[in-house]
Amino acid sequence: MGNIIDYARTETRDFGELPFREADALVLAQLSYDDVPECVPRLDDIESRYGTLHDRVKQFDPRHPIRSVRMLRKPPFDGVTIARADDELHHGSAVPDHNVENVGLVDPQVTHDFYHAIAANPRFSGIEMGAFLEQFDGDEQTQFAAVTYLLPSGALVVAYRGTDDSLVGWKEDFNMAFQYPVPAQATAADYPGR
């Protein structure tokens, strides 16, 4: 039986031929655990450029109602393709040539191969990724990361990174036994509205 890396390598049909499905969601969710290069736009930078939904409502200009409504509904998606992100991160190298940060107990070569398989696959390579947000606070015992993907159809897919195997990750997992929501859950609930 194949695994998610096999799927990322072999399922090359485009989304028009085979619509987005659970396995694709798993690929994008797994990708959120990997390193995200600097070329992927950060949510804070996007918000400073376009504002939050609340900011866009306040900036409505009755002299330009059509443009204002478009910006209100859907600001432009700032993103880079998965292929470009892979190139920025790995520079075409067959082995990881950077300090891999987000793999936990996973072999960095496996992480590298997974990223490269997605970037080389026509099904995934053109998907854009943006609005990356990452927070890590040892004092608050919280970690959070999310990235938004833009599919060729125009649909957005939000992928959240769960806790990792760090001490902060373990503490956050234990905190969930008696605290609701933990700070990362509150941030996750706020993320789509930003």
Say what each PLM segment does.
Residues M1-R194:
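Non-catalytic, mobile gating and regulatory segments of ester bond hydrolases
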